UniProtKB/Swiss-Prot annotation:
Inhibits calcium transport into spermatozoa. It comes from the Eukaryota. One of its GO terms (molecular function) is peptidase inhibitor activity. PROSITE patterns: WAP. It holds the Pfam family WAP. It comes from Cavia porcellus (Guinea pig). Keywords: Calcium, Glycoprotein. Residues 7-55 form the WAP domain. This is Caltrin-like protein 2. InterPro entries: Elafin-like_sf, WAP_dom.
Length: 55
């Protein structure tokens, strides 16, 4: 969802990622929070962006 050209993010913060996959451009499973079921957020993950429960 966008409001006046800006993406609206869901509350909370993304979990911290400690290790990343070796792929140069891993595929993303989401592009914004609104690609994820509520209340999840679209966050950088181990290998590309994924939906996670916010912290």
């Amino acid at each position: 969802r966008r409001l006046h050209g800006q993406a609206i993010n869901r509350p909370g913060s993304c979990p911290r990622v400690m290790i990343y996959c070796p792929a140069r451009h891993p595929p993303n499973k989401c592009t914004s929070d609104y690609d994820c079921p509520k209340p999840q957020k679209c966050c950088p993950g181990y290998c590309g962006k994924q939906c996670y429960q916010p912290e």
